[in-house]
Amino acid sequence: RESYNQRRRFLLHAYEEMGLTCFEPMGAFYTFPNISRFGMTSEEFATRFLEEEKVAVVPGTAFGDCGEGFVRVSYAYSLDNLKEALGRMERFVKRLDGRE
């Protein structure tokens, strides 16, 4: 349980550092960061992130229309894997923001 809490806190902090908002999950081991500021659908974000950085996230729309503007990220992975994935997400977000 503590390892899940540690990983959840790591993701939430990483999102904050990237300027992404995300509600803290209270149950499952998924986060839903808000990606709406990038002006693309959650499907487009997920597809490009997979193609460009080789990291899979689930488009929020897979969970209904209210999921648009969000992607689902699981933290049921090792902290090392999450660090690698979030490093790639940071690089991707910087490109989308025109900072890289």
Functional labels for PLM-detected ranges:
Residues R1-E100:
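PLP-dependent class I/II
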